[in-house]
Amino acid sequence: MGTRKTAITRRDFLRAGTCVTLGSLVGLPLAESTHADRTKKSRVVLVRDKHVLDGKEQIHPITLGRMLDRAVTALLDASDPSSAWTRLVKPDDIVGIKTNVWPYLPTPEPLNTLIRERLIEAGVKGGNVSADDREVLRNPVFQRSTALVNVRPMRTHHWSGLGTLIKNYIMFVSHPSRYHDNACGGLGAIWHLPHVKGKTRLNILVMITPLFHGMGPHHFSRAHTWPYCGLIVSEDPVAADATGARIIQAKRDAFFGGENPINPPPRHIDAADTRFGLGTSRLERIELIRLGWTEDILL
């Protein structure tokens, strides 16, 4: 099995790398057929609840569950959370939950648990659900997956400007560092690899305590996080990331007392739209639904 996996990832990497290189050389987007429908708005739900954190910034799972249910129900115009989840997955699906395990700001374990519970309640077998990050290429559930749920916290990032939903799929390639050039502008190519393409059912950008400033690789300072107490949920990863980026930028400007651009600029968000056709990054093409707590919403 190891030989087969290596052969696939090498071939897939070369295929994606060709797209990145050609796009960079000629300065043009990929073929128009890869682009999202330009006439349709992407729905993004921002849900916030100040009670999701206690005084010690520990997460209340019940409150978090209510936030998740409200967001998914609103996203799909469903009558209730159960019907929303049954529209996202079917009982015969094999679902990988792509998390993020960066130790300073990982995907909250209560959220991983909630997603797993909702998937099983929707009829997916427990043995066909797995949450993973760095071992996705070796995880048997991910190797057989028919569906993915993409969930991670937003934070500033040394190479890509922002750690985003788009960037979260970098572990689906065998050599992630090869995507660091040009502020990781080619990350969108990963989403077109055969073992990823078309599988993502839901994107959840965790904005509970996002990191809005950092200096150097793997830098983290609690002083540069804040209790935003939110989740951004969408079927469109680009629209979700663009919304989160607006919040991070607004927080930076407020904190530093003036314009303080994200550095390096998160070029991969716009490129995911204009070069790779993964969704929309433009404000006028995003339908933003705000739910819950509105104080200091920054949007």
Residue ranges and their predicted role:
Residues 2-299:
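N-terminal and secondary-structure boundary signal
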